From Swiss-Prot:
Pfam families, sorted: CRCB
Topological type in the membrane: Multi-pass membrane protein
Organism: Campylobacter fetus subsp. fetus (strain 82-40)
Record's protein name: Fluoride-specific ion channel FluC
GO molecular function, one term: fluoride channel activity
One Gene Ontology CC term in the entry: plasma membrane
Function of the protein: Fluoride-specific ion channel. Important for reducing fluoride concentration in the cell, thus reducing its toxicity.
Top-level taxon of origin: Bacteria
A single BP term in Gene Ontology: cellular detoxification of fluoride
Reactions accelerated catalytically: fluoride(in) = fluoride(out)
Subcellular location(s) of the protein: Cell inner membrane
């Protein structure tokens, strides 16, 4: 892997992490009393959609390796988060909020996968 590719991954990751932080803050301001990690769910659904879209697009057109690395590995890797998802569920379980923990786990898995497929499907329709 070239230094240039590593740079693009790092730069994309930084931007994705910044957007994740802004998204979490924005969602917290809209729903200040919500005891559900909606910000993390939001970024994981958005990331699921865009990785499906971009990977499907990459199978139909030639995307520069640095651009793909920036967008997929860097930006979407920084935007989405499994570690925060895990931590938030641990907190929900420790506080006895089993319903929200279950809903959060199911929502993240099912909706992220559904939106990933939706992004993939959009490109499939575009190139049919």
């Amino acid at each position: 892997m070239s230094f240039t590719t590593i740079f693009y991954i790092g730069f994309g990751g930084a931007l994705g992490a910044i957007l994740r932080s802004f998204t979490n803050g924005f969602v917290s301001k809209i729903f200040p009393n919500l005891s559900f990690p909606l910000g993390t769910l939001s970024v994981n659904i958005i990331g699921g959609f865009f990785i499906g879209f971009l990977m499907s697009l990459a199978s139909n057109i030639n995307i520069d390796i640095n651009l793909k690395s920036f967008l997929v590995t860097g930006f979407l890797g920084g935007l989405t988060t499994f570690s925060t998802f895990s931590y938030e569920n641990m907190l929900l379980l420790q506080s006895g909020n089993y319903t929200n923990a279950f809903l959060n786990i199911a929502s993240n898995l099912l909706l992220s996968l559904l939106f990933c497929y939706f992004g993939f499907w959009i490109v499939k329709v575009m190139y049919a």
